[in-house]
Amino acid sequence: QQASCVLKLVKDGRQAELQFTLGNDADVDQQRLAEAIGQLRQTLPLLEADPYLQLNDSAWQSHSVQDQTLPEIDQVLAQIELGAGGLDLVGIYAAGPICRGFASSFGAFGWHQANSFNFDWSLFHSNGQAVKANYAGQQWNSDAFALRLRQAREQLEYLGRPLKTLAPGEYRAYLAPAAIDEIMGMLCWGGFSAQSLATKNSPLQRLYAGDARLNPLVSIAEQVSGSLSPAFSDEGTPRSDLRLIEQGQGLDRLICARSAAEFELTANGADGHESPCALSLAAGDLEQSDILARLGTGLYISNLWYLNF
């Protein structure tokens, strides 16, 4: 179990912040809190005023508890052992609640708690190559996990076949969800950030400027509702769902309080780094069983590594 606390002290346009780890001893934690506040009070007068400091002074309230029942660890391990019989499997399973809280002297208070699990594993072939797979969510489904493990087992068999060298050229390709996730993660490096867009540093600059567009089937949202992410930012601003890309066109952008002050915008609950916390890509209509038939002689790309700009 891990817990940490972030304290921020603000006065006369100045702000100071301190983060420290909490333990299981209330008396010790209270002493750490008192010492942290004292340190912040000494530091604050020494700092320069922040011209883009913007505080949310509303007394908003937010409370969400997603208390889904997670399976017992023995049950999970038994199913993994049953499904992985005869396989060289190495993985990490993590499960439990994730909690986030916020409180301000203006009277704002937010609490978010959600249970989730994540099983990340690799299946190794005798030739040293491996298939990486993952199963995560908030409700464990034995049938869904068995299917995911069976798919990984089938992919493992292909690693034993002779390698095929591809000549440079254009190929019809299918990108599996794990590969798309890598691309989406790279786009989060300032892609939807109001600050990056305002300073012309966003990888999606042409999209948001209207000079380019994606396929109309592409819609991406910041889907905070029902997600593992809280409905409030670390800056104390309530957040809601945003339509970042709708039918291939750039729409909403992530705006933190600082960017709102600097570029005369309205903050919409983004954290200071302005990266998505609950990115959701709209689903298509291609069934899993139809992928290879639709792909034909094209390339099936299960994952991507080391992406960069």
Each predicted region: which residue ranges?
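Active-site bordering "gate/hinge" segments
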Residues: Q1-P230, T237-S240, E246-Q249, C277
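Dual-mode signal for accessory low-complexity, basic/Gly-rich regions
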Residues: A36, L40, Y208-F309
